Amino acid sequence: MVIYEGNRFVAICRPGLLANYLNQVSPEYKGVINIYEGKAHYKINAVVARELAFQFLTFASCDIQVMGEALIAENEDDFINIFRKVYTERLIMKGAYIQSTAESIETAFRKVAQ
């Protein structure tokens, strides 16, 4: 995976270390983090990415709300699958919670190749 803060290169990392790298993103940066995994491209707000990584590293799990349902990541594969399955560009901070602004399944989840 290749990580950029906006257009500034940050790191190349194994998927299993994604949370560690996202936790180290500069707190002053408020823009979008771009993550490339092969041909896949994921975008996520830097504030949301840091909070998601912080929760995962601190509590050994993190959760997001998508259409009122909680998606919980309890291991590294689950954490990475949040990026692979959910439109992360729709995630926002709502108080202390991370929530998707999607209103339908089509706008909440990415199409996964069969």
Swiss-Prot record:
Name of the protein: DNA-(apurinic or apyrimidinic site) endonuclease
Keywords attached to this entry: Bacterial host gene expression shutoff by virus, Degradation of host chromosome by virus, Endonuclease, Host gene expression shutoff by virus, Host-virus interaction, Hydrolase, Nuclease
Gene Ontology biological process terms, A to Z: degradation of host chromosome by virus; symbiont-mediated suppression of host gene expression
Organism phylogeny: Viruses, Duplodnaviria, Heunggongvirae, Uroviricota, Caudoviricetes
Keyword tRNA processing on entry: no
Role, per record: Performs endonucleolytic cleavage at abasic sites, which are generated by the base-excision activity of host Ung. The cleavage generates a 5'-deoxyribose phosphate and 3'-hydroxyl end. The sites are specifically recognized through the formation of a complex with host Ung. The viral endonucleolytic activity damages the host DNA, blocks host DNA replication and induces cell division arrest. This may provide an advantage for the phage and save nucleotides for the viral replication since it specifically targets the host DNA, which possesses more misincorporated uracils than the viral genome.
Cysteines joined through disulfide linkages: none
The enzyme's E.C. designation: 3.1.-.-
Family: Belongs to the apurinic/apyrimidinic endonuclease family.
Assembly: Interacts with host Ung; this interaction allows the viral AP endonuclease to localize to newly formed AP sites and cleave them, leading to inhibition of bacterial growth.
